[in-house]
Amino acid sequence: MLNVYIGYDSVETVAYHVLAHSILRRSSIPVSIAPLMRTQLKGIYTRARGPTESTEFSLTRFLVPALSGFRGWSVFMDCDMLCRMDFAAIAREIGRQSDKAVLVCKHDYTPSSKRKFLNKIQTVYPRKNWSSVMVFNNARCKALSAAYVNSASGLDLHRFKWVRDELIGELPIEWNWLVGEYKHNAKAKIVHYTLGGPWFKQYRNCAYAKEWRNELKLARHAKVER
């Protein structure tokens, strides 16, 4: 069973549900999906939300190894994504890079816009968006204790100051394809609406919007027995 945690934000609830559906619909291996919700982390996550935290899960994502009991492997994903791949591929990658502490897509880019969804500030820093898809080898991420996550700076967390560089494995960049930053790619495996997704009026015609709306329709479907 592969445990998957999806960041949950109260202003993007539909994004969580569509992403979860897109994963379940394509996976040929057992996956367990859980929302990473601040309201469920009382007593574990104690810090106040900072002005540069654009989502409710900006920093709670780094609690995934602790929430997993520092055992096994766990996946974290931002909610503003659409899965177009079988998660069996992630399991295979875990097998190939079992010596690493965390696997990420190593983006090297500068954001094209100073603002993103809901007019929020686009913070620029090294290793931007590496943390939006993380595959944790939980036993090797014990530095991410609740005490550390509650006290470390956001930049130190997102820039992976908690792990040695040689322990950061690399995933194909197509597994976190940045919509609005990268050109359209028919082979993208996980589409990331990092500037804003089609559930926001401003981005309803963004790249891959039609695919997302189709996934929403499929998620809403229920066959009624008569």
Regions found by a protein language model. Give the residues of each.
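Alpha-helix N-cap/loop-to-helix initiation residues
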Residues: 12-13, 83
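A glycosyltransferase accessory/donor-loop signature
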Residues: 1-2, 11, 17, 29, ...
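GT-A fold catalytic core of metal-dependent nucleotide-sugar glycosyltransferases
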Residues: 60-111
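Active-site-proximal specificity loops/subdomain of glycosyltransferases
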Residues: 31-68
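Short, surface-exposed amphipathic charged segments that create phosphate/polyanion-binding patches used
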Residues: 47-53, 116-121, 185-188
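Conserved catalytic core of nucleotide-sugar-dependent glycosyltransferases
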Residues: 94-157
